[in-house]
């Protein structure tokens, strides 16, 4: 269970989180969406204990101070496209081995699990390389595997699908769905891609300028907000690369081809 009540956080002079309140039950997949500077990453940092709120109440899995609760930290994993966990000067394989030791995992069980994850995330050929030699998508696959090593009860994914090929991305999201069912875990997921959120999440929290302006089902947000945003495009011949659309400006969109 994650409980937030009247959470406020300033960064400099900016009020990034403004009286945020909600609770998340075990076995929920929750998408946290919003335009750039809406407060998504700061919110996850507060939940993870990386940042302390200026005011308000927070409880994560029974703990009111996640950052100082070692048992709770082992149950929580935070994978970010902007904040990396792998050691830069070590091979990916060495980072995994360090993670097994750091989390005090059963070595035999952890290595068997690691072998399974390396196969699923298609990184067997990458583990002998250093992170700086990897492409963004390759690195994110390795970061995701590292984040899953300790079989976390709460998994936070902050733009963690960036750079991934579509086929790999949706295979990974299927895995997360199965993982949640098997572990009765909680997944918090931020993305600019609403289609990703639809595929992974049951519930959406929409932030705007640090406040919650919507909290409900995927179906409800589509019904209430989708009619407000439309984009018309004309093209001939080969379709443009829609991955290059400026989503940070327009947000995600649905596309209908006629």
Question: Positions of the model-derived regions?
Answer:
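Helix-to-loop junction immediately C-terminal to a conserved catalytic motif
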Residues: 48
